[in-house]
Design a protein with these regions (language model features):
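Conserved C-terminal helix/tail region of periplasmic/extracytoplasmic solute-binding proteins
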Residues: 277-316
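Solvent-exposed, polar/charged alpha-helical surfaces in well-ordered, non-transmembrane soluble domains
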Residues: 50, 106, 123-126, 150, ...
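Short, surface-exposed acidic
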Residues: 135-140, 241-253, 289-302
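Short, glycine-/small- and polar/acidic-enriched structural segments
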Residues: 2-136, 140-149, 154, 158, ...
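Positions that flank functional sites
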Residues: 41-42, 67, 167, 186, ...
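Pocket-lining segment of extracytoplasmic ligand-binding domains
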Residues: 151, 156-243
Length: 316
């Protein structure tokens, strides 16, 4: 079987375990062929969840809120389910430049946020500001998704949401230590991101192929977590992509991200009900859970159990 996997962004160290599995052919002798599809194919005009729901790919990487959107809030004949999480820890943050004078979220009132046109980003930032004592009064601009960080560095707006083991390392190597505001520091629960998702119907038909893929990828991520420097060398040597040309940069990025891949039991991919429930409860409290017709959906009406499974990871 050929599995097509839609990446959530251009290739980067989030995808390290995926590429380790491919480079080392960890699914050899299984008959499985795997193709990774980057958002670059259309400059991120179509979300990965849309590609998944429309049957273009078998697996999609995306934040948890995209799954909620397609699974619960839209009329869809192709329900999707999370089958693994890439990271256990939150690795993103809202950031400002060191010379901006903005060192706390409350100082973002009246400022401009450069966004990605995705669910919840404005609501999360507003809540972050309010949790720090501000009003949450921000303006929003939306450059092309793949250009947001460059526009931020050009000071077209004061704040953006970045992945610290990538954009954070870029800024670090430019001598720009970013002011980073983490959601968890302000008691805002955020879902797993990114997660791997698949259509339930396809999972039922091809369960063995998904198990082979996920268990190989888990080996790749364990290797990346335990040997970040060696993994960096492997990626730079084998990946013909502009993002993987600078060994010093990739090594530093791998060192930053490696502690986030595994849980306390040294397992990759496992999701916990408590985190899903806390996230959905927060969405309910902020009136962000809505059905496709716009009516409110409460956390009490939503069981998170059907949203995800750990059963394909081969560790239970």
């Amino acid at each position: 079987m050929q599995l097509k996997v839609a990446l959530d962004w251009t290739p980067n160290v989030i995808h390290a375990g995926l590429y380790v599995a491919q480079i080392e052919n960890l699914w050899k002798d299984s008959g499985l062929e795997v193709e990774y599809i980057s958002v670059e194919i259309d400059n991120y005009q179509k979300k990965t969840t849309q590609r998944l729901a429309e049957g273009e790919v078998h697996i999609a990487l995306s934040p948890s809120e995209h799954l909620l959107d397609y699974r619960l809030l839209r009329e869809t004949t192709a329900p999707i389910k999370a089958i693994a999480t890439v990271m256990q820890q939150e690795t993103s943050a809202f950031v400002t430049l060191p010379d901006s004078g903005i060192t706390r979220p409350t100082q973002l009132d009246g400022k401009t946020y450069g966004g990605y046109r995705t669910q919840l980003e404005r609501e999360l930032l507003t809540s972050l500001i309010q949790q720090d004592g501000g009003k949450g009064d921000i303006s929003l601009v939306t450059p092309p998704r793949l250009d947001v960080f460059d526009a931020f560095l050009q000071r077209q707006f004061e704040v953006c949401w970045v992945f610290l083991p990538w954009e954070g390392v870029i800024a670090e190597q430019m001598g720009l230590p970013l002011n980073a505001f983490h959601l968890h520091d302000f008691h805002i629960p955020y879902g797993y991101s990114p997660i791997l998702m698949a259509q339930e119907a396809v999972l039922a038909q091809e369960e063995e192929a998904f198990q082979i893929f996920l268990q190989a990828v888990a080996r790749g991520y364990r290797q990346a977590a335990e040997q970040p420097e060696e993994t960096a060398k492997l990626l730079v040597e084998h990946l013909d992509h502009p993002n993987f040309q600078d060994l010093a940069f990739i090594t530093r990025a791998m060192q930053v991200i490696a502690p986030s891949f595994l849980n306390g039991q040294q397992q990759w991919g496992v999701m916990q009900a408590e985190r899903w429930n806390a996230y959905v409860q927060w969405l309910d409290e902020h009136h962000l859970l809505k059905r496709h017709d716009g009516t409110h959906l409460s956390a009490d009406q939503l069981s998170t159990a059907p949203l995800y499974t750990n059963n394909l990871l081969g560790i239970f």
